[in-house]
Amino acid sequence: MNRTKLVLGAVILASTMLAGCSSNAKIDQLSSDVQTLNAKVDQLSNDVNAVRADVQAAKDDAARANQRLDNQAQAYKK
């Protein structure tokens, strides 16, 4: 009887410890995945900001070109 309780207690203790280890491994993996995703989000944010600046420069160039065309069209109408 005592031996059965001892073996049962050892099995429960071992399974609890193994479950704890696997949970820690999963938590570590998830933490690593989150860090990787955060790095990718930061990179994408930087890329969006760079593209945003390029788009604004293209808009400014287009506005200047349109203004020059408007000025030329007005010169021909006179």
Curated annotation (Swiss-Prot):
A lipid is attached at C21 (N-palmitoyl cysteine). It comes from the Bacteria. Residues 1-20 form the signal peptide. A lipid is attached at C21 (S-diacylglycerol cysteine). Its main location: membrane. GO terms for biological process: lipid modification; periplasmic space organization. InterPro entries: Lipoprotein_leucine-zipper_dom, MOM_Lpp. The modification N6-murein peptidoglycan lysine is found at K78. SUPFAM superfamilies: Outer membrane lipoprotein. Homotrimer. Belongs to the Lpp family. This is Major outer membrane lipoprotein Lpp. It comes from Yersinia pestis. The gene is lpp.
